[in-house]
Amino acid sequence: MVQLSRRGLLQKTGISAIAATGFAGCLGRGGGSLDSVTVAYVPIFPNMQHYVMEQEGYYEDVPRDVTVERFSSGPSVVKAFASGDVDVALFGITPAMVLADRGKEAGILAANSKNGFKIMGTTELAERYDQDGPATFERFEQEKGRKIRFGAPPDGSVPDIVLRYWIQEDLGVGEMASTINKSKVPPARAVQTIQSGDLDATIIQEPFATIIGQDERFGELAWSGDILSNHPVTVLFASQQVLDDSELAQSLVEQHTAATQFTAESPDTAAAHAASVIGSGVSEELATTAMDSQASDYISDPHAITDQATTMSEFVANVGNIEQPVGTENLFAFDPYDAIQE
């Protein structure tokens, strides 16, 4: 059974934070198996499986009551997950690394998406990069008297890590801080910010990359799948209590895998589901167009992202969001996925 968001329910009934704590306790957060499970998600395109699972009724087949809760950002999910308010989350892999680094007993059950960004810039910059490649950065600064202005989410976020890898490892043009002028711009604001002329470039996910690409003033410099091939974007992350309940964990992965298959076979319908849940200016037409992008790449197999997760973890540690790189054994829970493959 899929229920209303607990947060929305509490707001509607005016229950205090103290009562909320008691209510959470009633949902089986003590020892033993869970009677219900709270699934948190961030409303972004890379979490496509969630929209399919919710709209197609796949959560109904999970053998526990499912409560779905929407969060505005990865950090807000990290806080809720760390405090035990949610059991399962669909969010970026770097927030999962932060939780693992903090000692939270949990693991990645499935991958959601990979290769999910495009580096978009002004037509002038895109043409210059096409011609000059890595030398673009130095020549731009020589001619303009300033560094390229890049918009990206906060340090240590998935797109930030991919951007760092591109500049420092793929292109080898130096440390990011000395190569570009980075502004912290959330994905939802990137389109407006670059169109207003405040940015020269941005690293952006779908469907925002499609919006920018439809404007003749802008072009594509690079696709993240060519920068760090098969890098993860978002994941399905579960608490230890979920992992200990093999029936529940396997069911979540089974429904997730079914949603990935549904997305591959019926991309237009999946796009419509995403648009209906995300809202915020994401129309069905835009979502459908964005599904044709290289940056719309959905998977479930957690084994497919382990190598690049290790690489990304090193960068997250260098940024300072985690104390040291998180090992695969401390980040992934492969058994439920492997069990349903047998």
List PLM regions with ranges.
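N-terminal secretory signal peptides and thylakoid transit peptides that target proteins
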Residues: 1-22
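Short, well-ordered beta-strand elements
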Residues: 32-44, 64-70, 147-151, 181-183
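Short, polar/charged alpha-helical segment
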Residues: 43-71, 75-76, 97-102, 161-170, ...
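Short helix-initiation/N-cap motifs at beta->coil->alpha
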Residues: 45, 68-79, 91-94, 175-196, ...
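A conserved helix-loop-strand patch within extracytoplasmic ligand-binding domains
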Residues: 112-183, 240
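Pocket-lining segment of extracytoplasmic ligand-binding domains
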Residues: 186-276
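Secondary-structure end/capping motifs
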Residues: 244-322
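Conserved C-terminal helix/tail region of periplasmic/extracytoplasmic solute-binding proteins
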Residues: 313-342
